[in-house]
């Protein structure tokens, strides 16, 4: 399934949450007549598991994005817990403007309880045509998600098309605008998206953008003593540019982009441990988990 598979995993209070590609199946009776109908329909799904004595004793689905689709790209899907609520990003699966449609989960941030139910104070829970899990709309391919302990806010990274990657905040009931806007990017053939605007009044504006695209992926807000020079900086991975970069982030503004590592391969994931050590995952033929060391 191209970019599909296991998408993210999160441990919290003896539970794990896993986002992954769920195969919904197809209408096999039509396969011999229409080969395209043999493609499986898939959804971004989330399962919750219980850990006891370092063993997984249960694993059950708590969320399945709607509708299932056959497209095999732009899954996004990162997980974060804040105030005992689970936030998850759902990519737009190359469906474009459906991110503005309230009757689906495509291209959105969803917020659910740990059992998969929708919180009553979600922004659209009382709207008859909105799915109650929807928290934020208008995203393309949100690849990273992190909680900033300094301001208790959640932030994301998102892939633009040909340019327009961005770092921005998850804000209740807001709209990033895809694909009415492309955040400064264009389509892959160079044509404009929407009316060519990078941003419009009424939409949430990204905090920091990359033009051309670097395929920004995972992120953390670094807190630790192992690399004191990185404290309170945003650390981000890049697939296309194959870099680990840092941004200063103060008062809602990002600046001073600095390349920390370059040329190791497509950097997919970044994490830190309690000691402040930093680990990255390379999404390439030379895949593996690497630990950063001091010079």
Feature names for model-found ranges:
Residues 130-169:
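Repeat-solenoid scaffold signature
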Residues 110, 169-199:
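Mobile, glycine-enriched helix-loop/loop "lid" segments at the mouths of ligand-binding/catalytic clefts
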Residues 267-269:
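Repeated scaffold domains used in trafficking and secretory/extracellular systems
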Residues 118-121, 154-157, 175-181:
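Acidic/polar loop patches that form or flank catalytic/metal-binding clefts of enzymes
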Residues 1, 49-70, 105-144, 194-211, ...:
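Blade-edge beta-strand/turn elements of extracellular beta-propeller
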Residues 1-96, 146-160, 212-250, 273-294:
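Acidic, Gly/Ser/Thr-rich repeat motifs that build Ca2+-stabilized beta-propeller blades
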Residues 141, 161-163, 174-175, 183-187, ...:
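Short, catalytically relevant binding-site loops at active-site mouths
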């Amino acid at each position: 399934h191209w970019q599909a598979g296991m998408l993210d995993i999160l441990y919290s209070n003896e539970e794990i949450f896993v986002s992954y590609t769920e195969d919904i199946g197809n209408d096999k009776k039509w396969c011999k007549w229409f080969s395209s109908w043999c493609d499986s329909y898939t959804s971004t799904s989330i399962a919750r598991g219980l850990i006891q004595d370092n063993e997984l004793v249960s694993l059950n689905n708590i969320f399945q994005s709607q509708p299932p689709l056959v497209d095999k790209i732009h899954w996004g899907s990162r997980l974060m817990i804040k105030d005992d609520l689970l936030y998850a990003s759902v990519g737009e699966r190359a469906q474009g403007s459906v991110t503005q449609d309230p009757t689906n989960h495509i291209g959105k941030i969803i917020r659910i309880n740990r059992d998969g139910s929708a919180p009553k104070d979600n922004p659209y829970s009382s709207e008859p045509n909105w799915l109650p899990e929807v928290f934020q709309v208008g995203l393309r391919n949100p690849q990273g998600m992190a909680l900033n302990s300094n301001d208790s806010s959640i932030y994301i990274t998102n892939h633009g098309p040909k340019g327009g990657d961005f770092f921005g905040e998850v804000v209740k009931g807001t709209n990033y605008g895809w694909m009415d806007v492309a955040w400064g990017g264009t389509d892959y053939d160079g044509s404009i998206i929407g009316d060519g605007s990078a941003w419009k009044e009424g939409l949430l504006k990204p905090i920091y953008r990359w033009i051309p695209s670097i395929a920004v992926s995972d992120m953390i807000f670094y807190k630790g003593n192992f690399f004191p020079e990185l404290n309170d900086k945003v650390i981000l991975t890049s697939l296309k540019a194959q870099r680990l970069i840092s941004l200063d982030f103060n008062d809602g503004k990002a600046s001073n982009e600095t390349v920390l590592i370059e040329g190791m391969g497509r950097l997919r994931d970044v994490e830190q441990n309690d000691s402040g050590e930093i680990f990255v995952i390379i999404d390439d033929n030379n895949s593996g988990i690497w630990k950063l060391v001091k010079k």
